Amino acid sequence: MDLEGWKEKTALCCRLLQMESLIEASGHISARVPGTDQVIIHPMQASRATIGPRDMLVVDLEGKLLEGEVAPPSETHIHVSIYRHRPDVLSV
């Protein structure tokens, strides 16, 4: 699956978690793109109920923005730290 496919899957997860009331009012969802040093993360400004793949941000394992139109959320460092230290983890 390519990056766009992973962005769609991650956005779908955001919508499903919101629809099923399985996520708190704040917080971010992220996913590691398998075989890469890229992480897809939900931006603070986007609604989890309506988010689509174009809304998702892509950062590297240092938290540097690679793709997207807004700054990564302040919690990005927590997500990427988990991915750096736990290669087996694919989502947070």
What are these regions (language model features)?
Residues K7-V92:
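An anion-binding catalytic pocket shared by soluble metabolic enzymes
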